[in-house]
Amino acid sequence: MAQPLYVSNLVVPAANIVGSTAKVKCASGCDAVVFATMKGTIYAYMASQKPTTINDTLLWATYLSDRNACQCGATGPQNGSGNFDMWAVDDPWWGVLSTPVIDRTANSLCAVTWTNDQQYRLYNLSLTTGRIQKGPVVVQGSVGGQTFAPNTSGFIQRQKQRAGLLLSNGLLYVAFGGDNPDALAGWLFVYDAATLAMKTVWSPTPNGRNGGIWMAGDAPAADAAGNIYVQTGDGDLAPASHSFGDSIVKLRFQNGALTVAGFFAPCDQMLLRQCDLDQGSSGPVLFRSVCGWRREGWKALLHAHRHDGGISTWSVSAAGRRLPARRARLHRWPQPDPEMAGFDGPHPWRANRLARS
């Protein structure tokens, strides 16, 4: 599910504020929390005031899905069953699954929602009023032998826009994974964040199979130079054919396209694929190196900065610390300490300190 987003000192014109308490206290600026829901609605609430009723602190609410919202429990897009997909996902609603992204410079928020007419739509909203500024833009594209086609029966709901959105250097990155044997390819769409004009699209397996970008809901990572990092799930690994399943991939946007600048694939990649263990079961984490986590509990630390030209295989600087996957899952990296790794999951939150090298 989408994670809540915190916004400090958000100024909302009093005339646009819904809640009575918020109307008094937020016109000159207040802390806020933004929620995106599976019903396709995005809410902004005042965070610094305990409400008498939940609507007291409501700043604004914007319904993205309109009449096309998926009421899976009522009708269901999968063979008329009431299940969302082949895995019998029976969420009563299916709308905004991924975490949106906020651009404080432009005072805007971008989000993606699924609609029951077999389409994903991208929106740009005003952070102060919630009004739709750009969009909806239908997500679609093709690369190599793969096509992301809206309005194709049974196709789009097999694509999951689970990974959070990334904003880097004015570009918006939207990643997908697939959960059907016929539609498992991963996708990474790139848009101009201000206009929502599509710039390019990349697939980890353009002429192969699988390689979804799931990352447990994490967004792709970006470094100061604008390089983008993703982790891919089970899939074909054939770098000569531009296939990067079960890999940590470093991408660079240049000349209007995403190119692979480097990658790491574990030596047991074939085993990972056969056992559905997914190198890409978490998002990559940047500090001095790149940290990736796989489903059964191994991590790899990579020297990403050593590879600035061409496609190159990263070296593993440290691997072998094993944590049971059922007890810990890497999702985020607390700041400002660049050497602390946080793990969360069904057991108590824990942290490991990494030694300098």
Residue ranges: model-predicted function:
Residues 1-290, 294-314, 319-321, 348-357:
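Mobile, glycine-rich extracellular loop/lid and propeptide segments
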Residues 325-343:
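Inter-blade linker and blade-boundary elements of WD-repeat/beta-propeller domains
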